[in-house]
Amino acid sequence: MDYIISPIVTEKTTLMMEKENKITFLVNRKATKEAIKNEVEARFNVKVAKVNMMIAKNGKKAIVTLAKDFSAEEVGGRMGIF
């Protein structure tokens, strides 16, 4: 099942991508941390170090921290963010 709905692109998330190697996604409300980790690793061929989740007004957000060997900016480029 596809849990990732779309990347969230704001000034704050772009700074997190550049400085902290994190990508923020809007995800399905039933998604778990493990499911998001597996989907990101499979879809983008990267290694995920950590997943933080929060429920906001507009849905559930997942902040994915990539392993140091991988670049969040490169993944963002592949998604069409940059």
UniProtKB/Swiss-Prot annotation:
What GO terms describe the biological role, i.e. biological process, of this protein? translation
Listed GO MF terms: rRNA binding; structural constituent of ribosome
Q: What Gene3D superfamilies does the record tag this protein with? A: 3.30.70.330
Q: Which InterPro entries match?
A: Nucleotide-bd_a/b_plait_sf (IPR012677), Ribosomal_uL23 (IPR019985), Ribosomal_uL23-like (IPR013025), Ribosomal_uL23/eL15/eS24_sf (IPR012678), Ribosomal_uL23_CS (IPR001014)
Which Pfam family is one of this chain's hits?
Ribosomal_L23
Q: Which UniProt keywords apply?
A: Ribonucleoprotein, Ribosomal protein, RNA-binding, rRNA-binding
Q: Name one GO cellular component term.
A: ribosome
Task: Give the protein family.
Answer: Belongs to the universal ribosomal protein uL23 family.
**Subunit structure of this chain's protein:** Part of the 50S ribosomal subunit. Contacts protein L29.
**Any idea what job this protein has?**
Binds to 23S rRNA. One of the proteins that surrounds the polypeptide exit tunnel on the outside of the ribosome.
Tell me what this protein is called: Large ribosomal subunit protein uL23
> Which taxonomic lineage is given here?
Archaea, Methanobacteriati, Thermoplasmatota, Thermoplasmata, Thermoplasmatales
What gene is behind this protein? rpl23
